[in-house]
Amino acid sequence: FHAVSSFCNAGFDLLGGRFGAFSSLAGYNDNPLMLGTTAALIVVGGLGFFVWEDIVDKRCWSRLSVYSKMVLLITAVLIVGGALFFLMEEFDNPATLGDMPLWQKGLNALFQSVTLRTAGFDSIGQGGLSDTSKAMSCVLMLIGGSSGSTAGGLKTATVGVLLLALRSGLMGREQVTFRGRAIHYRRVLNAMTLALVVLFVFVFSSMVVSTVEDLPYLDSAFEVASAMGTVGLTTGITPTLTPFSQGLLILLMYMGRVGILSFSIAFITGNRHPAKIKYPEMNVMIG
C-alpha cells in the first residue's frame, strides 16, 4: 500500500493507528531505509513515464533527449537545493530538526525536499516549520513533478522554460535555448501564461482562505499550494476549516490535477489558424 502510495505521489498511509493520528511517517524519521525507499519511489513516480522510457531505451546520458536532460537536471537541482535549504533553515528549530543528530537532520531535510514535490508524506511536523520554510515549501509544492507523471503542479519543464527565458532576456538573446536547441516562442508564451494563471489563482485563493478563516496568510497559502499541487501536506489547520474553505480546497485539487493538465493540452493541441490580419508593431516602455 505504501509503495503504491509513494510511487503514485498519493501520500496516503495506514500508520495512524501505530504512531497517532496524522503522524504520517514521523515515527520513521530515524529510519534511513524507510525514508530512503519512500523518497526514491516518489522521485521515480514524479519523473514521468516519457523520461523513464527514454532512459530505458537510451541508457546513456549523451543519447537522452533534450527534454529528458532538462527534467533530470531541474529535478536534481530542486531536490538538492531544497534539502540544503531546509537543513540550514531548520537546523536549530526544536519543532522540526533541532533535536536530531546531524545524520538524521540531513535525512529528514532531504525527505522534506522530496515529499513537497506532490507526495504528501511527512517525517516532521509541517506546523513547526519556520515562516521562511513554509514560503519555500509553497514554491516547491507549486512546481510539482514532471509532465506525464503521477505528480501535480506546474511541472519541472515549465519552470525550466521560464528560467531559460529569464536567462535569455538578461543576456539580450532573441532565442530561448537549451543545450544547442532553440525552444519555440509559442512554448515560452505557453509557459508564461500557465505560470501567471497558477500564480493568480494561488494568491487570490490564499487571500480568500485567510480572510474567511481569519488565519495568517502564510498558513493559508501553505494549504492552498498543497491543494493546487495535489500534495496533501498541511500545517494542521485543514480539519478546522469551514465547509466553504474545504470546498475551495477541493476545487483547487481538481484544478491542480485536471485543470492545469487540460490547460496545457489546450495549448499543445489546440487548432491554430494563420492570422488574417498582421498588425503593425509598437514599442512599449518596460521597467
Placement of each model-derived feature along the sequence:
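Membrane-proximal intracellular helices of multi-pass ion channels
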Residues: 1-287
